[in-house]
Amino acid sequence: MDKNTTSELAASIRSIPDYPKPGIIFRDITTLLGNPRAFRRAVDELVQPYAGTKIDKIAGMEARGFILGGAVAHQLSSGFVPIRKKGKLPHETVRIAYSLEYGVDEMEMHRDAVQPGEKVILVDDLIATGGTAVGATKLLRQIGAEVVGACFVIDLPDLGGRKKLEELGVVVHTLVEFSGH
């Protein structure tokens, strides 16, 4: 991706200081999603590394990963799998606990959403500490999926999430980096 595209995408993301608490800069992609050109460009860039590759499923993490993941799945002619917070899915699920910056939570997916050996890409808006993405990777692998990659619009490299995923052997693709929290 060229620098001009990176700059355009970064400019389409709203930064909100001191949200959700003092010292944090929240990176809000709703402005990117509301801009047809930026949204299309972001999806095209998320898809690009996998063009021509057979990907069975895209796993989107709640909630913005649903928006981006659905668009990526459509472009790759893949199925879409929502990974949700505990208690939100109506059928038989598999669940995993994962670490958050300040505690532990659980996520789940339908047990029959991915078959053993299927190639899956994780999609979300942002990778920070990596807790959610690492948890989703472990959940997918628990049911036999092959996690072939993960893509995010935003990387906050100072928080180390990308490195944690790469240590699990997941190839990570991001579009924009912001320093800090």
Swiss-Prot record:
Gene3D superfamilies: 3.40.50.2020. Keywords: Cytoplasm, Glycosyltransferase, Purine salvage, Transferase. HAMAP family: Aden_phosphoribosyltr. This is Adenine phosphoribosyltransferase. It is found in: Cytoplasm. GO terms for biological process: adenine salvage; AMP salvage; purine ribonucleoside salvage. It holds the Pfam family Pribosyltran. GO terms for cellular component: cytoplasm. Belongs to the purine/pyrimidine phosphoribosyltransferase family. The lineage of its organism: Bacteria, Pseudomonadati, Pseudomonadota, Alphaproteobacteria, Hyphomicrobiales. Catalyzes a salvage reaction resulting in the formation of AMP, that is energically less costly than de novo synthesis. Pathway: Purine metabolism; AMP biosynthesis via salvage pathway; AMP from adenine: step 1/1. Signal peptide: none annotated. It catalyses: AMP + diphosphate = 5-phospho-alpha-D-ribose 1-diphosphate + adenine. One of its GO terms (molecular function) is AMP binding. Homodimer. Its EC number is 2.4.2.7.
